Every structure is written in structure tokens, then in C-alpha cells.
UniProtKB/Swiss-Prot annotation:
Any one biological process term the GO annotation gives: translation
One GO cellular component term: ribonucleoprotein complex
Keywords assigned: Mitochondrion, Ribonucleoprotein, Ribosomal protein
Gene designation: RPS11
The name this protein goes by in its record: Small ribosomal subunit protein uS11m
UniProt source species: Marchantia polymorpha
Length: 125
């Protein structure tokens, strides 16, 4: 691996993929190592409308579409960061794998409250 301007050849083929899986949609964003967005895909942009956007099949199709574009951009290896509690978490990983990308690392970055908000006062009747 030769270094040229501080970036190795391995980093040119490596990208970071953010999967945001909500109960209504799945959004996949591909960035390079500097955090610059290269491409994105969502269930709505693939062609699913309404309640079909929140299905496992829609998440897998979205991931396959994002993987296809990533390979065209020259990326081969993927570091995945998953955020959210939606239905498309596992199926989007399967879609990235079926799309031809090699997954090197998987991290769950879902925010969890340490104590949360204060609950409302008890109701006095």
C-alpha cells in the first residue's frame, strides 16, 4: 500500500456506510473516510411508497441499490454503522452483501438514554 497525500490505496476502496432504520423508512448513506457523502439511497427513492417502505424487502432493495452505486464509484470494502430500531436492520446488511460489497466491521450506534427525560407528575384526582 503506497501512501499518496496521506491516503492509502486501501482507504480509497474502503467506505463507511450509515444505515438509519426507522419504523417508517430505511436510509443508507455511503461516505468516504473523511465523512464526505458519496451517495445515498432510501426505500422511497428506490420506488416503495406508503407502508411498503418499512418492510424488510424494501430495506434489502435499498441496500442492494446503494451497493451497486458504491461498486461503480470504486468502493469494495464497507464499514457499517447501524442506527435505529426499525425492521430493516438485518435485511439491509444482507442487501449490502448481496450487492457485492465486503463488510469489514459492524457497529450499532443507536442512541440510548442513560436515564431519559423526567416523567410527568402523578395525576391527582
Amino acid at each position: 500500500m503506497q501512501k499518496k497525500h496521506g491516503i492509502t490505496n486501501m482507504q480509497k476502496k474502503h467506505c463507511i456506510t450509515y444505515i438509519q432504520s426507522t419504523f417508517g423508512n430505511t436510509i443508507i448513506t455511503l461516505t468516504d473516510y473523511n465523512g464526505n457523502t458519496k451517495t445515498w439511497s432510501s426505500s422511497g427513492s428506490v420506488g416503495f411508497k406508503g407502508s411498503r417502505r418499512s418492510t424488510n424487502y424494501a430495506a434489502q432493495a435499498t441496500a442492494e441499490n446503494a451497493a451497486r452505486v458504491a461498486i461503480q464509484l470504486g468502493f469494495k470494502f464497507v464499514e457499517v454503522r447501524i442506527k435505529g430500531l426499525g425492521y430493516g436492520k438485518e435485511s439491509s446488511l444482507r442487501g449490502l452483501k448481496l450487492g457485492g460489497l465486503i463488510i469489514t466491521k459492524i457497529r450499532d450506534v443507536t442512541p440510548t438514554p442513560h436515564n431519559g427525560c423526567r416523567p410527568p407528575k402523578k395525576r391527582r384526582v
